From Swiss-Prot:
Antimicrobial peptide with potent activity against both Gram-positive (S.aureus MIC=50 ug/ml, and B.subtilis MIC=25 ug/ml) and Gram-negative bacteria (P.aeruginosa MIC=25 ug/ml, E.coli MIC=3-50 ug/ml, K.pneumoniae MIC=25 ug/ml). Exhibits little hemolytic activity on human erythrocytes. The lineage of its organism: Eukaryota, Metazoa, Ecdysozoa, Arthropoda, Hexapoda. One of its GO terms (biological process) is defense response to bacterium. It comes from Vespa tropica (Greater banded hornet). Expressed by the venom gland. Belongs to the MCD family. Mastoparan subfamily. It comes from the Eukaryota. This is Mastoparan-VT. AXPX repeats lie at residues 4-7, 8-11, 12-15, 18-21.
Amino acid sequence: EALADPIADPVAGPNPEADPEAINLKAIAAFAKKLLG
C-alpha cells in the first residue's frame, strides 16, 4: 500500500482488505473519468 500511487489513496475507499490491484484499477478508472469529465 505504501508503494501505491498517492492519487489512489482517497479513491480506494474504506476497505483496506480489498485486492490492492483491484483498488488500483478502480482508482485509475475514477481518475480517468475525472480527467475526461
